Amino acid sequence: MAKIMVAMSGGVDSSLAAALLHEAGHDVTGVTLHLWEGDDDRLAESLCCSQEMTESARRVCAQLGIPYYVFNYQREFRRYVIEYFLREYASGFTPNPCLECNREIKFRALLARARTLGFDYVATGHYARIRADETRHNGEDAGLPPAERAQRTTYRLLRAVDREKDQSYMLYMLGQDDLARLIFPIGEYTKAEVRAMAAARGLASANRPESQDICFVPGGDYRNLLREERPDALRPGPILDLEGREVGRHQGLPLYTIGQRRGLGIATGQPMYVTALDVARNAVIVGPESALRRESLRAEWVTFVSGMWPEAPFDCLAQIRAHADAVPARVIPGEAGTVDVHFSRPQRAVTPGQAIVFYDGDVVLGGGRIARD
């Protein structure tokens, strides 16, 4: 029997994760991370930090008869996620704050706290799988001491069985020490199976709808947050075509992203898309749809799940956004955490600031941030 901390959002996925581990005989404790204090009705009730979701997690733990606690990580969330989010936008990148939340809060900080409190493992409701050597690890072998597991096992991170819900792209930053202490109990199930299993157990969260929003930007409209927190970053400037001709004016680089067509306020006689954000000139660059396609990119801050930097170029599948298809690519390792990636076919709207993740079939090799040219 292992002592397992389950990170619970109040949704059905983490609720079932807790239930499955409890049923398997483990000593399970549920925890919710309080990350963001919404004011002026910014925080919707369906979002992970809302009072309603916290109460949902509490009710599930009461049903299961397991302890439940709320950890306050607002200060860390502000520092590592919100400030990053604002800084990246102000610098002409399009960030993915959920990646930083996973990296700094949900895994780095929570794993450290779990270790301090004497827990063997942390479990979450993520749709992904961990394989120890050739043996799938989803909680069945959680009785092994973590130190022993880590010493004798190589861990691989895999896509979930449910490809529509797969979250492995968001977990590429996990390393061997992380995977040795993590459990993803629902990675082998489809979402429909998860809901059915939760309903069969009478879990209060069985039919709770999912939220697709960034937790501190309900509705996906980050512009108001930028206006409140970084008004200096919203400097008007020119919209330039590919020949450098001014075809309009923009209201601030952070309000635009690669591939955007709507809301440009320009009339050029043909559809025009944002192809680049030129920070040096404070200019939005636009061009035809064909100009969005890229055959290669450079990635920075690259890490590999194995913990080992590749010594030679390698072929893999590369995915440039959370819900994009992974396509064949060749990765050429560089220096200081950078790689060059050459695609087998041009990719549309490659966006600096987003993540690129490398796969070998279902296995996550690693990933990094797409750099600016």
From Swiss-Prot:
Q: Which residues does ATP bind?
A: 7-14, 33, 125
Catalytic activity reported: S-sulfanyl-L-cysteinyl-[protein] + uridine(34) in tRNA + AH2 + ATP = 2-thiouridine(34) in tRNA + L-cysteinyl-[protein] + A + AMP + diphosphate + H(+)
Keywords from UniProt, A to Z, are: ATP-binding, Cytoplasm, Disulfide bond, Nucleotide-binding, RNA-binding, Transferase, tRNA processing, tRNA-binding
Q: Name one GO cellular component term.
A: cytoplasm
Q: List the disulfide bonds.
A: 101-215
Location of this chain's protein in the cell: Cytoplasm
Annotated region (Interaction with tRNA) at 165-167
Any one biological process term the GO annotation gives:
tRNA wobble position uridine thiolation
Q: Which GO terms describe its molecular function?
A: ATP binding; tRNA binding; tRNA-uridine 2-sulfurtransferase activity
Please give the Pfam families that the UniProt record associates with this protein. tRNA_Me_trans (PF03054), tRNA_Me_trans_C (PF20258), tRNA_Me_trans_M (PF20259)
Q: What is its EC number?
A: 2.8.1.13
Q: Which residues form the active site?
A: 101 (nucleophile), 215 (cysteine persulfide intermediate)
- Site annotated as Interaction with tRNA: where? 126, 354
- Describe the function of this protein: Catalyzes the 2-thiolation of uridine at the wobble position (U34) of tRNA, leading to the formation of s(2)U34.
Query: What family, per the record?
Result: Belongs to the MnmA/TRMU family.
Protein name stated in the entry: tRNA-specific 2-thiouridylase MnmA
Instruction: Record the organism.
Output: Roseiflexus sp. (strain RS-1)
